[in-house]
């Protein structure tokens, strides 16, 4: 919603409605014009490309990555595969589905033993670090898997890497 005179409009009743024809946001019958959207959301519908796709369809500009890049980045296992194919160094790890875990948890546990400790167990499509657990001992792996699987049916298990996190914006 747009800030007008330092205050946000009050939203009552139904949710606000974005109008393709008027390039605006209708709140209680009042049309607020939109210059650009700053999608400051995490997780599903915010980082997964859905909002970006919707905004693309109605022609409203926004700040940040496009729909396809957002969708790819939301799935950690897919993003990791994409980066590896592009020749970018990635942390050693495996992807485990819920079906694999339920079918043979011991084989999965055996396969991660070579990764070394500590490691991270992450819901592949979890946002805001939900479903992410740092595992320091193999005995904690099963509970970490259950935690991650409570957020997604696909889990990424990676060896922890010490390093600096670097972020940068790219302007087209």
Locate each region found by the language model.
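Conserved anion/nucleotide-ligand pocket segment
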Residues: 114-143
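Basic phosphate/pyrophosphate-binding loop/patch that engages nucleotide-derived ligands
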Residues: 82-90, 147, 166
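Hydrophobic beta-strand scaffold residues
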Residues: 61-62, 90, 119, 155
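ATP-binding N-terminal substructure of ATP-dependent carboxylate-amine bond-forming enzymes
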Residues: 1-68, 72-74, 78-85, 96-110
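Phosphate/pyrophosphate-binding betaalpha-module
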Residues: 89-96, 122
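Structured loop/turn residues at beta-strand edges in well-structured enzyme cores
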Residues: 32, 88, 115
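Phosphate-binding site of ATP-dependent enzymes
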Residues: 133-172
